[in-house]
């Protein structure tokens, strides 16, 4: 609290008795006591501050002891001059922790106030001017930008160059043998290893952690290499299978091509212009598109007209009933093979005919005479054996 002292001057009244000069108050019967020296005030002038009386020489600043004549400031029972009061109880500098007089120019950084000479970098001691970049630390210290970046760089380098622990060959052998026994040893085992090797307990623990991480990483890399080799082999095998399909020649046997060369020729069993003679003629090979599962060769000729069916024996497996409609009423020539179906089974070709025409025929292909080619797509059709010899014996050759 600031209190301005009131200075009361009491002059002697002329013509008064001499005893009255001892009293500064006309109506006060007693002599006042000085608050500074605890003596009676017999001076001509009396000072009054804090509701107490003072000698003019006793009212002084508590810090600088300068006599106070016009104005003073007090805090508690002490009296101060203006400068000392603001130094002690006013705003303090964040750097030197001293009070700042209200008449002095200051600098501010956020909520902190500094003297002009205290507003400087703590590293290079350079006083910061208006416009300079600086960093305000947590303890209200100031660091210029150049020194701050340099300190950060040194700290990063010191962190990167942490001290390394050197393990001798004997210590490494002991740790390896313990790892082979148990990759994750208990605490008492680590303590025993620490005493045997002379290494710190923390060093032993970190060594086991790094060892387990290394083993896990090696296993993961090995698995990745195995899968990579597997996929490379698969890609290589696919490429070689495509080249093998392109290099297959017409006379070569495969899983999809079966040649019945050992069976008797059907041309020897029928007339020259019959169906069996036309089956022995060469025909263009029908194959699957490029990129399919395999190529299929048909060693049978096309059927040119319905006259050939009349020469077949009634009861023959190839017998087809005559068409009820006249040839003139039939639509235009229809393709005998309207669609090609390539199932994943051993069937190479499944043609289908138009309604009212000849029943669809099935070309069989297999791995040998004993193969069974009955599939779901052949439901409704009689399943013939793979070899024609097994059912040709039932045909009466005398009628041909």
UniProtKB/Swiss-Prot annotation:
Subcellular location field: Nucleus
Leader peptide range in chain numbering: none
GO annotation (BP), single: thyroid-stimulating hormone-secreting cell differentiation
GO molecular function, one term: zinc ion binding
Modified residues (Phosphotyrosine): 230
Gene Ontology cellular component annotations, sorted alphabetically: chromatin; nucleoplasm; nucleus; transcription regulator complex
Stored CDD domains: homeodomain, LIM1_Lhx3b, LIM2_Lhx3_Lhx4
Residue span of region Disordered: 215-280, 297-400
SMART domains: HOX, LIM
Chain positions with Phosphoserine modification: 74, 237, 241
LIM zinc-binding domain mapped to chain residues: 34-84, 93-147
PROSITE patterns: HOMEOBOX_1 (PS00027), HOMEOBOX_2 (PS50071), LIM_DOMAIN_1 (PS00478), LIM_DOMAIN_2 (PS50023)
Cross-referenced Pfam families: Homeodomain, LIM
Sorted UniProt keywords: Activator, DNA-binding, Homeobox, LIM domain, Metal-binding, Nucleus, Phosphoprotein, Repeat, Transcription, Transcription regulation, Zinc
DNA-binding region: 160-219
Compositional bias segments (type: Polar residues): 368-380
Biased amino acid composition, Pro residues: 319-334, 352-361
Subunit and interaction comment: Interacts with POU1F1. At neuronal promoters, interacts with LDB1, in motor neurons LDB1 is displaced by ISL1 and a ternary complex is formed in which ISL1 contacts both LHX3 and LDB1; allosteric structural changes in the DNA binding domain of LHX3, induced by the ISL1-LHX3 interaction, may explain differences in sequence specificity of the different complexes. Interacts with LDB2. May interact with CITED2/MRG1.
Notes concerning its domains: The LIM domain specifically interacts with the POU1F1/Pit-1 POU domain and is required for synergistic interactions with POU1F1, but not for basal transcriptional activation events.
Function: Transcription factor. Recognizes and binds to the consensus sequence motif 5'-AATTAATTA-3' in the regulatory elements of target genes, such as glycoprotein hormones alpha chain CGA and visual system homeobox CHX10, positively modulating transcription; transcription can be co-activated by LDB2. Synergistically enhances transcription from the prolactin promoter in cooperation with POU1F1/Pit-1. Required for the establishment of the specialized cells of the pituitary gland and the nervous system. Involved in the development of interneurons and motor neurons in cooperation with LDB1 and ISL1.
Name of the protein in question: LIM/homeobox protein Lhx3
Lineage: Eukaryota, Metazoa, Chordata, Craniata, Vertebrata
């Amino acid at each position: 609290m600031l209190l301005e002292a009131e200075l009361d001057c009491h002059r002697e009244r002329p013509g008064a008795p001499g005893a009255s000069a001892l009293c500064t108050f006309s109506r006060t019967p007693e002599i006042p006591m000085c608050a500074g020296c605890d003596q009676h005030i017999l001076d001509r002038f009396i000072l009054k501050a804090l509701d107490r009386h003072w000698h003019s020489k006793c009212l002084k600043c508590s810090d600088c002891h300068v006599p106070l004549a016009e104005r003073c400031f007090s805090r508690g029972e002490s009296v101060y001059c203006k400068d000392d009061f603001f130094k002690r109880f006013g705003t303090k500098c964040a750097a030197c922790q001293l009070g700042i007089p209200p008449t002095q120019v200051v600098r501010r950084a956020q909520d902190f106030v500094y003297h002009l000479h205290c507003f400087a970098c703590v590293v290079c001691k350079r006083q910061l001017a208006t416009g300079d970049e600086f960093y305000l630390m947590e303890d209200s210290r100031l660091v210029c930008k150049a020194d701050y970046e340099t300190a950060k760089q040194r700290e990063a380098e010191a962190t990167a160059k942490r001290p390394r622990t050197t393990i001798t060959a004997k210590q490494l052998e002991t740790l390896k043998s313990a790892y082979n026994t148990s990759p994750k040893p208990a605490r008492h085992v680590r303590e025993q290893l620490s005493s045997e090797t002379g290494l710190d307990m923390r060093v032993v623990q970190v060594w086991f952690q790094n060892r387990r991480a290394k083993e896990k990483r090696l296993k993961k890399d090995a698995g990745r290499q195995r899968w990579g080799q597997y996929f490379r082999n698969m890609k290589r095998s696919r490429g070689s299978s495509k080249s093998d399909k392109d290099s297959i020649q017409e006379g070569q046997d495969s899983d999809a091509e079966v040649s019945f060369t050992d069976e008797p020729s059907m041309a020897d069993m029928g007339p020259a212009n019959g169906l069996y003679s036309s089956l022995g003629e060469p025909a263009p090979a029908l194959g699957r598109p490029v990129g399919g599962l395999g190529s299929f060769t048909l060693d049978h000729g096309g059927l040119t007209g319905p006259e050939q069916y009349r020469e077949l024996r009634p009861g023959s497996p190839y017998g087809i009933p005559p068409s009820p409609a006249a040839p003139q009423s039939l639509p235009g020539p229809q393709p005998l093979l309207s669609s090609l179906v390539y199932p994943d089974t051993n069937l190479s070709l499944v043609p289908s005919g138009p309604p009212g025409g000849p029943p669809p025929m099935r070309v069989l292909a297999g791995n040998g005479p004993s193969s069974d080619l009955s599939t779901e797509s052949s439901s409704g059709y009689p399943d013939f054996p793979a070899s024609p010899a097994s059912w040709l014996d039932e045909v009466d050759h005398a009628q041909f």
